[in-house]
C-alpha cells in the first residue's frame, strides 16, 4: 500500500470525486480530505506512480492540485519567512503557491508577512529559489529561511538550544545573556538568595565628604562662596555707581548766564568753607522778635467771636413765667459763659505759634 498526498484541493472537491479520479490508475483503499489537502491509499506501488505522473498539477475546479508520495512528518520541518505580502492575500492562496514546490505543513499570515512550514528541506530550498523576489498579487515578496524557532514551555524539552543566545547546553532562563543582549551578572542574585552578608550602610553621615557630623567641608565651601560673591557684588556696585555719576555729570546742560558761569568758576569760593551757627544771644533776639510778630497776628485773628452759640444778652424773664422760653435762654446763657471761660482761659493761654520762631531762626 502506498500513501499519496494531495495538496491544494479546491473547496468544491469531495471524497467521492477524488476517489473516482485515482481509481483510474489502481485500487483505492482509503481516501480522506482534511481542509484543503487529503490523503489517498493505493494498493499497488505501480498504480501510485502512474497516479503521481498523470495527476500532479491536474486542474480540478480551476485549481492545480499537487500529488506526490506522502512521507512521515519530519521532526524538524523547514520554516520559511515570507515578507511583503499583499494585504488581500489569504492563507489558502499563499499555501497553494508554496505547495507547487512540495507539501506544506502549516501556513500562517501575520500582518504583511507570513511563516510557511514545508515538510522537506529540499522543497523549501526550491521554493526560495523559485519564489524569492517575485511578483505575487501585485507585490514583490521575499522568501528566506526563518531564524526563529518554535518555543516550548519554560523547563520543557531538551537543552538543544537557547532562544536568547542560540547556544546549546542550557535553557533560556539560565542564559547569561539578558533580554537586552548584555551578559548578566548573577553574583548579586545568588548572594541575595543564599544570604550572603552585604556591606552594611553607615549609621551616620561621617563617611560622606559633604555630610559629616560637623559639616565642616560644606560650611567652609559656602563661606568661600559667600565671601567671593559679596566681594564681586560690592565691586560691581561701586563700578556701576561711578559710571552713573560720570554719565550724569556729562549730561548736565551748559551754563548760559555769564555771570553765573563766572560765579561758579571763581576761585574765591571755597567748597569746603563752613559757616558758624549764630550765637545764643542772637538766636534769642530773633526768637523774641518772631514771637512778638506771631502774637500780634494771632491776637487780631483769634480776638473775634465767631461762635454761633454766643448771642447778645437780652432781658432775663422772671421766675414766675415757668419753664418757658426765658428759662431755656437763661440756661443757654450760662452754658455759653462757661464755654467762653474755657476757651479764653485754657486753650488760648499759650500761643500755638510762639515756638516757631525758635526753629525759623535757623
From Swiss-Prot:
Keywords attached to this entry: Activator, Cytoplasm, Differentiation, Isopeptide bond, Metal-binding, mRNA processing, mRNA splicing, Nucleus, Phosphoprotein, Repeat, RNA-binding, RNA-mediated gene silencing, Ubl conjugation, Zinc, Zinc-finger
PROSITE patterns membership: RRM (PS50102), ZF_CCHC (PS50158)
Coiled-coil blocks: none
Protein name in UniProt: RNA-binding protein 4
InterPro entries: Euk_RNA-bind_prot, Nucleotide-bd_a/b_plait_sf, RBD_domain_sf, RBM4_RRM1, RBM4_RRM2, RRM_dom, Znf_CCHC
Lineage, broadest ranks: Eukaryota, Metazoa, Chordata, Craniata, Vertebrata
PTMs per UniProt: Phosphorylated. Phosphorylated in vitro on Ser-307 by SRPK1. Phosphorylation on Ser-307 is induced upon cell stress signaling, which alters its subcellular localization and may modulate its activity on IRES-mediated mRNA translation. Phosphorylation on Ser-307 is induced upon cell muscle differentiation.
Glycyl lysine isopeptide (Lys-Gly) (interchain with G-Cter in SUMO2) crosslink site(s): 79, 92
Any one GO biological process: pancreas development
Amino acid at each position: 500500500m502506498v500513501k499519496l498526498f494531495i495538496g491544494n484541493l479546491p473547496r468544491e472537491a469531495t471524497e467521492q470525486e477524488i476517489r473516482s479520479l485515482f481509481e483510474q490508475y489502481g485500487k483505492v483503499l482509503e481516501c480522506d480530505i482534511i481542509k484543503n489537502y487529503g490523503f489517498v491509499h493505493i494498493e499497488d506501488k505501480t498504480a501510485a506512480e502512474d497516479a503521481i505522473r498523470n495527476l500532479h498539477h491536474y486542474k480540478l475546479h480551476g485549481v492545480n492540485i499537487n500529488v506526490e508520495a506522502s512521507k512521515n512528518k519530519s521532526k524538524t520541518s523547514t520554516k520559511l519567512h515570507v515578507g511583503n505580502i499583499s494585504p488581500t492575500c489569504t492563507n489558502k492562496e499563499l499555501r497553494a503557491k508554496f505547495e507547487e514546490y512540495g507539501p506544506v505543513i502549516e501556513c500562517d499570515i501575520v500582518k504583511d508577512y507570513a511563516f510557511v512550514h514545508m515538510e522537506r528541506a529540499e522543497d523549501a530550498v526550491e521554493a526560495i529559489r523559485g519564489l524569492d523576489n517575485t511578483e505575487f498579487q501585485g507585490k514583490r515578496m521575499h522568501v528566506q529561511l526563518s531564524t526563529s524557532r518554535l518555543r516550548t514551555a519554560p523547563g520543557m524539552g531538551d537543552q538543544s538550544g537557547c532562544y536568547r543566545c542560540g547556544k546549546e547546553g542550557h535553557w533560556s532562563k539560565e542564559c547569561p545573556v539578558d533580554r537586552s543582549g548584555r551578559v548578566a551578572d548573577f553574583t548579586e542574585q545568588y548572594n541575595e538568595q543564599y544570604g550572603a552578608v552585604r556591606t552594611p550602610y553607615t549609621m551616620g553621615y561621617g563617611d560622606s565628604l559633604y555630610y559629616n557630623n560637623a559639616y565642616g567641608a560644606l560650611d567652609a565651601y559656602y563661606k568661600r562662596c559667600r565671601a567671593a560673591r559679596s566681594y564681586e557684588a560690592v565691586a560691581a556696585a561701586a563700578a556701576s555707581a561711578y559710571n552713573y555719576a560720570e554719565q550724569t555729570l556729562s549730561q548736565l546742560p551748559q551754563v548760559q548766564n555769564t555771570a553765573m558761569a563766572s560765579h561758579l568758576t571763581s576761585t574765591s569760593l571755597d567748597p569746603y568753607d563752613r559757616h558758624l551757627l549764630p550765637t545764643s544771644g542772637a538766636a534769642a533776639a530773633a526768637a523774641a522778635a518772631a514771637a512778638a510778630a506771631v502774637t500780634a497776628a494771632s491776637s487780631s485773628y483769634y480776638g473775634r467771636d465767631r461762635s454761633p452759640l454766643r448771642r447778645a444778652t437780652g432781658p432775663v424773664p422772671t421766675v414766675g413765667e415757668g419753664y418757658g422760653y426765658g428759662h431755656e435762654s437763661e440756661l443757654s446763657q450760662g452754658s455759653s459763659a462757661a464755654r467762653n471761660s474755657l476757651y479764653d482761659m485754657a486753650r488760648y493761654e499759650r500761643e500755638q505759634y510762639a515756638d516757631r520762631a525758635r526753629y525759623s531762626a535757623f
